[in-house]
């Protein structure tokens, strides 16, 4: 009986394996990538290292994807592949068919075997079929007991898209010559902490490995990239949630890289609700966070002041944006984010394709500014899809408004005309200035609604200027510290009020 577990997607890519001798200074090794429901497996595959970026590309040896030359043997495939039933989708061109030859059949007491894969045709373009693969089914039709002629007829009747379920049958292919084993290659060298990359840099040189390696897809980071020597975005960077394992892969072209990135991210996304539930339980157990709900979680790529980038795990609650270097899996780790941005003092100032004033070259980027007692913190992030950008944009804007509606009022000590005072800003009642002399009664010195505020500004050091018009004109308040936090909160209150009015209009 067939298992309900979906057959993994497999294909050949190239893994950055270390320093090379060419102009690009990098060595690449062909590997078999296998994507299952919750794990990504990388196995060493046959074949010489691929060309470095910018170098002329040589004709690929026929045995990389099948024995297309007479007498050539199939690749020495990794043990991981020998144990797998794989489902491969082949999309046929208008001419040329599947581009395979088959042998075997019930009359020969053998399964239906792929004996030849023709270079450049549909099967070869999948990079996931191999000479020696047994075809178990075609579009769901069982071929396990088919004769050779029956299999030929089934394959001939297929449409433009053909789903083949296959399994590599090394033991029943004695007439195929084994090719020599591939060189060893590595992937699991821990990156520097925090995870940082120079612009378009693939990360540290990995250690060698000679057998399959497995990376959990639980909250893994997936990013499409290019390199200084090859501007085509056909590279993938994949990091484990704990930041200890990093893969830097090269696909044959941009379309292939995009397809793999989409498929891997889709599997990561299916695991995200479970991660969110686990973090929600940890968050509820912390004494400082209370019972805040997690509104959004995901990896962002942050532009660093040095010019590099870093994977940053962002966790958005009802009140804060918490940024981590890796997935927090304990209460202690969750309570110690690398940075925290209170939403009420945070503004989304850019979302979408970068502009000339924004020093970031990503098409899908957004910028946040947070008012603090030390000034304004600015952070630039990018995401991998328009859907992610839309989700983060909406959640951040809505989060700012929720925080404003939840807080309602803030107060700060200040000095006005030499008198010690207290400034209260309420989302509905507006601005109230109270006398705060020691021993004196708490008297209202000034009260103005938001509707009267014509302009606000600050000097970036300690002074806040509020212009309500009328007889008072502009008032000057000395907050005795950087006024940016209160300025950003005033803007959040105003934005929330405008949104509230828009919803009621």
Curated annotation (Swiss-Prot):
Residues 483-505 are annotated as: Calmodulin-binding. Residues 1-25, 40-77, 180-210 are annotated as: Disordered. GO terms for biological process: muscle contraction; regulation of heart rate; regulation of sodium ion transmembrane transport; regulation of ventricular cardiac muscle cell membrane repolarization; ventricular cardiac muscle cell action potential. Its main location: membrane. One of its GO terms (cellular component) is dystrophin-associated glycoprotein complex. InterPro entries: PDZ, PDZ_sf, PH-like_dom_sf, PH_domain, PHsplit_syntrophin, Syntrophin, Syntrophin_4th. High expression in skeletal muscle and heart. Low expression in brain, pancreas, liver, kidney and lung. Not detected in placenta. It is a peripheral membrane protein. The modification Phosphoserine is found at residues 101, 184, 189, 193, 200. Keywords: Actin-binding, Calcium, Calmodulin-binding, Cell junction, Cell membrane, Cytoplasm, Cytoskeleton, Disease variant, Long QT syndrome, Membrane, Phosphoprotein, Repeat. It comes from the Eukaryota. Phosphorylated by CaM-kinase II. Phosphorylation may inhibit the interaction with DMD. Belongs to the syntrophin family. Adapter protein that binds to and probably organizes the subcellular localization of a variety of membrane proteins. May link various receptors to the actin cytoskeleton and the extracellular matrix via the dystrophin glycoprotein complex. Plays an important role in synapse formation and in the organization of UTRN and acetylcholine receptors at the neuromuscular synapse. Binds to phosphatidylinositol 4,5-bisphosphate. Monomer and homodimer. Interacts with the other members of the syntrophin family SNTB1 and SNTB2; SGCG and SGCA of the dystrophin glycoprotein complex; NOS1; GRB2; the sodium channel proteins SCN4A and SCN5A; F-actin and calmodulin. Interacts with dystrophin protein DMD and related proteins DTNA and UTRN and with MAPK12, TGFA and GA. Interacts with MYOC; regulates muscle hypertrophy. Interacts with DTNB. It is linked to Long QT syndrome 12: A heart disorder characterized by a prolonged QT interval on the ECG and polymorphic ventricular arrhythmias. They cause syncope and sudden death in response to exercise or emotional stress, and can present with a sentinel event of sudden cardiac death in infancy. The PH 1 domain mediates the oligomerization in a calcium dependent manner, and the association with the phosphatidylinositol 4,5-bisphosphate. This is Alpha-1-syntrophin. It comes from Homo sapiens. The lineage of its organism: Eukaryota, Metazoa, Chordata, Craniata, Vertebrata.
């Amino acid at each position: 009986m067939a298992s309900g577990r979906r057959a993994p997607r497999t294909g050949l890519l190239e893994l950055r394996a270390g320093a090379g001798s060419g102009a690009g200074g990098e060595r690449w090794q062909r590997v078999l990538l296998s994507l299952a429901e919750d794990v990504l497996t990388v196995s060493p595959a046959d074949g010489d290292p691929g060309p470095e970026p910018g170098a002329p590309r040589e004709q690929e040896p026929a045995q990389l994807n099948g024995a297309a030359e007479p007498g050539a043997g199939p690749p020495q495939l990794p043990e991981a592949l020998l144990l797998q039933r794989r489902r491969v989708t082949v999309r046929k061109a208008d001419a040329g068919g599947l581009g395979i030859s088959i042998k075997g059949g019930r009359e020969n007491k053998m399964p239906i075997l792929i004996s030849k894969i023709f270079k450049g045709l549909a099967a070869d373009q999948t990079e996931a079929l191999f000479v020696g693969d047994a075809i178990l089914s075609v579009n769901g039709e069982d071929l396990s007991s088919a004769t050779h002629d029956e299999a030929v007829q089934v394959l001939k009747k297929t449409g433009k898209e053909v789903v083949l379920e296959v399994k590599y049958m090394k033991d029943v292919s004695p007439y195929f010559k084994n090719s020599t084993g591939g060189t060893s290659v590595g992937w699991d060298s821990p990156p520097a902490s925090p995870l940082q990359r120079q612009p378009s840099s693939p990360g540290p040189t990995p250690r060698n490995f000679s057998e399959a390696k497995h990376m959990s897809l639980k909250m893994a980071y997936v990013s499409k990239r290019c390199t200084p020597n090859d501007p085509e975005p056909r590279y993938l960077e994949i990091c484990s949630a704990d930041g200890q394992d990093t893969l830097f892969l090269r696909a044959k072209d941009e379309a292939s890289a995009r397809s793999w990135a989409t498929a891997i991210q889709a599997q990561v996304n299916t695991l995200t609700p479970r991660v969110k539930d686990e973090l929600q339980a940890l968050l509820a157990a912390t004494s400082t966070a209370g019972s805040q709900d997690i509104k959004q979680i995901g990896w962002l790529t942050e532009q660093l002041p040095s010019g590099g980038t870093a994977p940053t795990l962002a966790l958005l609650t009802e009140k804060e944006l918490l940024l981590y270097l890796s997935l927090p899996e304990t209460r202690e780790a969750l309570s110690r984010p690398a940075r925290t941005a209170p939403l009420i003092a945070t503004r989304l100032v850019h979302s979408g394709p970068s502009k000339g004033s924004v020093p970031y070259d990503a098409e899908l980027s957004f910028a946040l500014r947070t008012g603090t007692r030390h000034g304004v913190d600015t952070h630039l992030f990018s995401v991998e899809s328009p859907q992610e950008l839309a989700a983060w944009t909406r959640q951040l804007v809505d989060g700012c408004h929720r925080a404003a509606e939840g807080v309602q009022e803030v107060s700060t000590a200040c000095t006005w005309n030499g008198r010690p005072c207290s400034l209260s800003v309420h989302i509905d009642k507006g601005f109230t200035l109270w006398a705060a002399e020691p021993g004196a009664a708490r008297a209202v010195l000034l009260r103005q609604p938001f509707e009267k505020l014509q302009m606000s500004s600050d000097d970036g050091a300690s002074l806040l200027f509020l212009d309500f018009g009328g007889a008072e004109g502009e008032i000057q308040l000395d907050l005795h510290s950087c006024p940016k936090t209160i300025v950003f909160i005033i803007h959040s209150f105003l934005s929330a009020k405008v949104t509230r009015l828009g919803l009621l209009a």
